[in-house]
Regions:
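Short linear S-[DN]-x-LW-Φ motif typified by the pepsin-like aspartic protease active-site region
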Residues: 55-61
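Single-pass alpha-helical transmembrane signal-anchor segments
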Residues: 6-29
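Hydrophobic alpha-helical signal-anchor/transmembrane segments
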Residues: 1-5
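Long, charge-rich amphipathic alpha-helical coiled-coil "stalk/tentacle" segments
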Residues: 177-210
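Amphipathic, interface-forming alpha-helical segments with heptad-repeat character
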Residues: 32, 40-49, 61-189
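Tight coil/turn sites that cap or link beta-strands
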Residues: 35, 52-54
Length: 210
């Protein structure tokens, strides 16, 4: 009887140990999905970054502080500014950015609102670039402006662990009054060209009859 009780106690103890071991393993092993990065802290201090795959941490000592999305994000910016020839325009720009894999910790610890900071840099860069150009030049050189803005903003965001992938200026819209004036000028130019072509056609007809 005593032997049976001893065996039962041993089995219970073994079961408890197995449960504890399994619990420790479950608390230790974690999987990082594709296009994510986990920041691990040890006793509340930064320890390391883990990328996609299966990893282990020390239970009750290490913890996953944050899960960072490594995909490319997009930010759209719209602002009003004035060109060199005093035309008010609404500029619409789009920029793509992502966390630099080599600076995941910097991106997390240094910048609380990356999209807000990026928006501020974009607006400042555009307000510096567009007023230096006439309306016609702004239209003609918008790709160059976008490239310069990308370089300027990219250098600023790199300090915080972010990479600016691509920046585009998708629209430069003059005020409605300017649009109306431009339409009138274009219409007058088209009418002038049409008149010239009609006169040329009549001249050719007269020569043909002669």
């Amino acid at each position: 009887m005593g032997v049976l009780v001893g065996m039962t106690g041993a089995l219970i103890m073994s079961g408890v140990i197995v449960v504890i071991v399994l619990a420790v393993l479950c608390a230790s092993i974690f999987i990082v999905p594709q296009q994510q990065a986990y920041i691990i802290e040890r006793f509340g201090k930064y320890n390391k970054v883990q990328f996609a795959g299966i990893h282990a941490k020390i239970p009750f000592v290490d913890r996953i502080s944050t899960k960072t999305n490594m995909r490319v994000s997009q930010l759209n910016v719209q602002l009003e500014t004035k060109t060199l020839d005093n035309v008010f325009v609404t500029v619409v720009a789009s920029t793509q950015f992502r966390v630099n894999p080599e600076n995941v910790a910097t991106a997390y610890y240094e910048l609380r609102d990356p999209a807000g900071q990026l928006r501020s840099y974009m607006e400042d860069a555009l307000r510096s670039a567009i007023p230096a150009l006439s309306l016609d030049d702004a239209f003609a050189r918008k790709d160059d402006v976008a490239f310069d803005v990308q370089k300027t903003v990219g250098a600023e965001m790199a300090r915080f662990g972010f990479t600016v992938v691509k920046t585009l200026i998708t629209a430069i819209d003059p005020s409605p009054q300017v649009k109306s004036a431009m339409d009138s000028i274009n219409a007058a130019q088209r009418e002038k060209e049409a008149t010239r072509q009609r006169a040329e056609a009549q001249r050719i007809q007269k020569i043909g009859r002669a």
